[in-house]
Amino acid sequence: MTSVESFIEDLASSTDADFASVKEFPLMPEGDAVDMGHAQDGTPLLDPRILDSPEFFRNPYPYYRILRDHYPVFHDKLHNCYWVTRYDDITECYFDDEGFNTIPKGSSSGVLGNTQLELSGVEHRRRRNLYGQHLVGQSLQARIPAIEKLANEMIDAWETAANDDSEFCSDNGNTRQLELSSMFANEFPIRVVCEVLGFPKEAQSQFYYWYNSMMSGLGGSATHKQGVEARQGLEDYVAGIVEERRKDPTYLLDQDGNPTSKDIITKLCETKVDGDFLSTEEITSNIALIVGAGGETTRGAIMNMWALLLRHPDQFDAVIGDGGNWDKAFHETLRHSSSIGGQPRHNTFDVEMHGVKVPAGSLMQMVDFAANHDERIFKQPESFNIFRDDLYYGKLLRSGYRKEGRCSHMAFGVGPHLCPGAWISHQEAVVGSKILLSRMKNPRINENKMPKDIDGKSPAPMGIISVRELWLEYDLS
């Protein structure tokens, strides 16, 4: 047994109270890790309690670097799981759908219903294809006018908010200041999902409540009941419109009020499998998954992308000069600072990775955050650079991309379980950002109102999920 293994065993053999107790770790300057000691051979030790600390959630990347370099498959006895942190190892597991299953049935089904998240193989592909066809290719392109219309409507509302001297939007002479999350990013992706699904406008406020409750309900027992109740409310509502949509389809409209395509609920209501219409439960589960996939991912992408671009003026100028660079900014943002941390898997057989034996049935956490910062794949991974030559910027592929020195990021995963909302999230973030830029003259961050780092002066790190507040100001003329 190495000295590192001995340290971990000693920690695990402590009393349960000691092992699980909250440990205070000092907040370190961005890029530095707390010194938790070293083994005799110089290997840095890692106390798994750091993974629950404010320091880790504030800036996890120094700790992911320790895991990648020294514990690429880390047996975390505190959380009873194995952390997998290298890009190549994670992609191998994602593509092996038989050997590394998704989360067990029932872990999210109470809130989201029986979704494809809990399926594998043929049944997973069948479920994915039921709605996936409506979120890619020409079908997705037909929905872009609706996305543009909603973005403009939300920005139009800023005028009223500023006149009312809103807490989050106000004017000062020729300058308007606003908080982007409250005035746009929080609600925009949910409005888009409502629109493309085909929810009537009068039901969208209720839908927003259902969404927030279901997402909150995935986080733990304290909010699980509320999430289940919200999901039931959504299913009851959908049941009331299924037959109506089969008889009288509804359509998405462009900014001039012209129909562009049938909404997704109508499409699902018209879908048959083996000669039978989908059940209300199946339709609701598909809707719940689309809602979850297209919400927080997009909100985080918009917030992080604008924060990063505005703090890298040369790259923001490149986006202003060429709208095609928004796609590059989107992909680099998700590589650099995704709001999606990873996906759990359970191995169906005993495996050994990097000398670590993982018994069948173990919980293995595939840490996409860490894979996106793997120095073996991406040069200077902690630098934000929309023109890096090692990142693939093209169409999102279920097969991933790894050619000619370029690799796809892992924010949406890869393989059979690539995030179902990846394509619509991309369009929401890019189309919405293009319209934001067209409606704001000389946008910049209002640093006086932004959260500060531990020195009280420099900007706070982006953290493990995404920027929660982004105060902007721009010229009105």
Residue ranges, per PLM feature:
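Cytochrome P450
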Residues: 2-477
